[in-house]
């Protein structure tokens, strides 16, 4: 039995939903919805941020194998910029729940608000540390997004994306100012917008 997680909430057809990637300056926001199988418990579930990368990777495979149903979804950079990050996150969560091949009786959403869903839903603050299905969803979402950021490191070298995963670290902000935004940067985010405006200003001065 794991301290901190309420295993009474591992019930038939309860989906846990979480997101990763609201704060970064680049890349998609990734969500996951997971319905765990009470007959096939997964040991070691916890908030993905509290686990090592190796442990997350191992749990990712175990969750995919043992869950009754799971779906990983996303909202792309273009959607984030057109909708705003909150609405894009809600859309991505909605896609994750709708993508489950089993309809849950209840969706438990990490955080303090719920997307519009066709099934009953409830928010759970710090749910990734309390509800096993939300913890599982956080692991699927984080591993998926981290893998994407590692791939972008090869496509857009010089930004350190593989290390900071797109978050606004000093290394990232310095590279953004020096190299300018890439196509995967969120132009609606202030540091990216500022770097883009500087870039456009330089271009205009050369015309």
UniProtKB/Swiss-Prot annotation:
Keywords: Cytoplasm, Endonuclease, Hydrolase, Manganese, Metal-binding, Nuclease. GO terms for molecular function: manganese ion binding; RNA binding; RNA-DNA hybrid ribonuclease activity. Its EC number is 3.1.26.4. Endonuclease that specifically degrades the RNA of RNA-DNA hybrids. It comes from Pseudomonas putida (strain ATCC 700007 / DSM 6899 / JCM 31910 / BCRC 17059 / LMG 24140 / F1). Belongs to the RNase HII family. A divalent metal cation binds at residues 18-19, 110. It is an enzyme of class 3 (hydrolase). Manganese or magnesium. Binds 1 divalent metal ion per monomer in the absence of substrate. May bind a second metal ion after substrate binding. This is Ribonuclease HII.
């Amino acid at each position: 039995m794991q301290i901190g997680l309420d295993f009474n909430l591992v019930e038939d057809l309860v989906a846990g939903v979480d997101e990763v990637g609201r704060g970064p300056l680049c890349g998609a926001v990734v969500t996951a919805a997971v319905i765990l199988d009470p007959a096939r418990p997964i040991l070691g579930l916890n908030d993905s941020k509290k686990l090592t990368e190796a442990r997350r990777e191992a749990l990712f495979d175990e969750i995919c194998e043992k869950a009754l149903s799971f779906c990983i979804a996303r909202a792309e950079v273009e959607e984030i910029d057109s909708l705003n990050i909150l609405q894009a996150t809600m859309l991505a969560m909605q896609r994750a729940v709708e993508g489950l091949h089993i309809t849950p009786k209840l969706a438990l959403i990490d955080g303090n608000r719920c997307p519009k869903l066709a099934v009953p839903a409830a928010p759970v603050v710090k749910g990734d540390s309390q509800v096993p299905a939300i913890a599982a969803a956080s692991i699927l979402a984080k591993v998926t997004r981290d893998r994407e950021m590692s791939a972008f490191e090869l496509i857009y070298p010089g930004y350190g994306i593989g290390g900071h995963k797109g978050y606004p670290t000093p290394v990232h902000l310095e590279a953004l100012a020096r190299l300018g935004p890439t196509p995967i940067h969120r132009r609606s985010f202030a540091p990216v917008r500022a770097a883009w405006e500087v870039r456009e200003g330089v271009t205009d001065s050369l015309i």
